[in-house]
Structures are given as C-alpha cells and as structure tokens.
C-alpha cells in the first residue's frame, strides 16, 4: 500500500498549525535537511512541503493526494479539487479597502478605479456580479502600499486583524469572502488511499471534537443531583456514581469552556464540591 501524500505549506503560521494538528492525531512526520519531503513511521503518510499557492495545482494533478491550504488559495486557483474538511484555524477574509480619507458611498465607487490585488480571479468574479468596471493591477506582495505610492486607488487583499490596513491608512469597505484552512482532495483516489484518508479524517475529527471541551468531575449531595444534571449538558447525559460517604455522589460530564464559567456559581450553590476540570485530547462521537 502506498503512502497518502499530503501537501503542506513549507513555512509560516499555516504550516505550523497544520503540523500541530497532525501531531495531535499521534502522527509524527520526520523532516529532511531541505524540508521538501517528510515521512511518518507510525502512519502511511508522506508530507510534501510546498508554496501555499502551488498546493491546489499539485492536488488537482494528483502529485499530492490531499492538501492543507487556505480556502482563499482554493478559490483563487479554481482547480479541480474537493474541499473535504474545514479546519477552523487560519481564519481571515478577503476584502476591498481604500484610503481612510475617502468618503465611501458603496461598491459603485470602484467603477473606473484601479485596484491592486494578488487575487484577481476572486475579485473579477465579484466585480462581474456587482456589474463594476474596474482595472486590476496584479501584484504578488505588499498590496497594502499600492494606494500610498499611487499604483492603485484601492486594494483587494487578505484581512485578519485589520492592523496592516490601519498602519497604511486604509479602511475596509467590502468583505468579499471568508477563508479558513481546509483540506482538499484530488478526484478519484484509489480505494487503498481512500481507506488511509478515512482513517486520517477519523483522527482529525476526534481531535477537533475535543477542542473547547473539558471533562468535569464533581462531588455533590444526592438531594441536588437532579438540579445539577439539569445545568450540565453532557454528551448524552452526565454519569452519576455513588460515593462511599452516604448521601453523596460523583458526577462526571463534558462541558464547553464558555459554558463552565456560566454555571460554576450555580454548581457551588447546589452544594458541588471538589470540582475538577480536565482537558480532553480526543473525543469520539
């Protein structure tokens, strides 16, 4: 059986998060001196380290079987690949921005204007839908400086926090699309590689299911069990086990981080003691 070939960005935040996810799936990938190809000794997986904008092409051509890449690159390259999993990290948006001192009246403002971008395909589709006639200035980097040096009237680029726009005296005026890290797959995988992919997706799901959840254990008087259970969500229902001390039980459940802080005072008011909150590495549903 051949290895499943996974394309990953060769450096940067997306690369770090991708390798972190694979590691949380208990798959360790060794890296060669040139960091072009990596192998796993405990799972039939081979990693190809590529430029992120090359990943859709490599996956579409079958050089890589799957890839972890920003959705923005998938939309821009528009290759024959299928998004099979959204990963929830490396979130950003693709937006139009203009100088802060301009009084923006709506998307029609871009008629007859010049827009600098590294994502011409996505922008062209958006402008066509909006019936906007603008000139595109395609550049490969430092898009945000284009208005300041007179290259363009506005820009279309990735926005995360928006701090880069502010530092270049720009303001975001139109959000065209959202993006996050996704897993894409080549069409027509062999049955053998599909089986490996299914196993990998199962591991990834168990890791993703655990995110933001905690295992909670507490001791409570039996008279308060029904009240406590009513505010503990659990996966099906909380586990209740009698303690050696008469009239007391131990209650176990799974709770989301944000929910715990909303109910902890109620738990204490109902007599809960010895509350333990434990991280969950993996959760199979």
Give the role of each language-model region:
Residues 2-44, 69-82, 87-93, 101-285:
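Small-molecule-sensing regulatory modules
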Residues 46-63:
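Short, structured active-site "lid" loops
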């Amino acid at each position: 059986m051949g290895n499943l070939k996974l394309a990953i960005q060769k450096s940067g935040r997306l690369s770090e998060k991708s390798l972190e996810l694979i590691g949380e799936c208990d798959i360790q990938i060794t890296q060669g001196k040139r960091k072009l190809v990596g192998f796993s000794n405990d799972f039939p997986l081979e990693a190809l380290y590529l430029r992120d904008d090359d990943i859709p092409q490599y996956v579409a051509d079958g050089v890589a079987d799957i890839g972890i890449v920003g959705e923005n690159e998938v939309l821009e390259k528009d290759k024959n690949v299928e998004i099979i999993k959204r990963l929830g990290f490396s979130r950003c948006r693709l937006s139009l921005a203009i100088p802060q001192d301009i009084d923006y009246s709506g998307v029609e403002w871009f008629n007859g204007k010049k827009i600098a971008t590294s994502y011409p395909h996505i922008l062209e589709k958006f402008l066509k839908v909006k019936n906007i006639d603008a000139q595109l200035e395609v550049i490969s980097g430092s898009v945000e400086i284009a208005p300041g040096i007179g290259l363009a009237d506005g820009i279309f680029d990735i926005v995360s926090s928006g701090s880069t726009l502010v530092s270049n005296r720009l303001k975001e005026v139109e959000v065209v699309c959202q993006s996050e890290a996704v897993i894409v797959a080549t069409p027509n995988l062999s049955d053998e590689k599909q089986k490996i992919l299914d196993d990998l997706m199962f591991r990834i799901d168990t890791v993703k299911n655990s995110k933001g959840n905690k295992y909670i254990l507490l001791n409570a008087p039996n008279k308060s069990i029904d009240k406590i259970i009513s505010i503990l969500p659990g996966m099906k229902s909380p586990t209740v086990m009698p303690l050696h001390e008469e009239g007391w039980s131990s209650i176990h459940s799974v709770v989301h981080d944000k929910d715990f802080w909303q109910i902890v005072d109620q738990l204490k008011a109902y007599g809960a003691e010895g509350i333990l909150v434990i991280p969950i590495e993996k959760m199979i549903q």
